[in-house]
A protein has these predicted regions:
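Formylglycine-dependent sulfatase
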Residues: 1-172
Length: 172
């Protein structure tokens, strides 16, 4: 397998030798997107909550946190997230509120790859195209996000863009 672009990134990129990863995904996601310790943004543990349910138990990253997507968008980049957000489901705390102009995926921790339901507790449907809840039962979620990401890259191939593709598969 030839990977010239990946090889170039490895040869010319930055190596982080003094970094850590939290034991659960939310704090690591917050650190990756903000470049700051996740506690500063209120992300100390695993966040969960249904956007369409009660928000009394929703944990969310503080919306005042500045994300990589916000900085790049201000610099003229198109910004998109395909897949998992998991930094807050409450309105005002989603990816479209934190610098991404496009989001296709889920807001909570993980969803079933065919029903697109979050399966902890009572469970709830969690699949969105931007802020619109969509239903595509029976379609394989990893393929859906790849297809959407490829379409986005083709549409914006003549301009700079930052695309984050966050797969759900590590949870299954």
């Amino acid at each position: 397998l030839q990977t010239p672009y990946m090889d170039s990134l490895a040869d010319n990129g930055v190596s982080f030798t003094q970094a850590y990863a939290h034991t659960v995904c939310c704090p690591s996601r917050a650190a990756l997107l903000t470049g700051r310790h996740p506690n500063r943004g209120g992300v100390q543990s695993w966040l969960q909550g249904d956007r369409n349910g009660s928000d009394t138990h929703l944990g969310n990253m503080d919306p005042s946190e500045i994300t990589l997507a916000e900085v790049l968008r201000e610099a003229g980049y198109r910004t998109a997230l395909f897949g998992k957000w998991h930094l807050g489901a409450k309105f005002g705390h989603g990816p479209l509120d934190q610098g991404f102009e496009k989001h296709f995926g889920h807001l909570s921790g993980f969803i079933d790859n065919f029903t697109h339901y979050f399966l902890h507790g009572q469970g709830y449907h969690d699949l969105y195209d931007n802020n619109e809840e969509i239903f595509r039962r029976g379609e394989y979620f990893p393929e859906m996000i790849v297809d959407e990401a490829v379409k986005y890259a083709a549409k914006h191939s003549d301009e700079p863009f930052f695309m984050m593709v966050a797969f759900n598969l590590p949870h299954y």
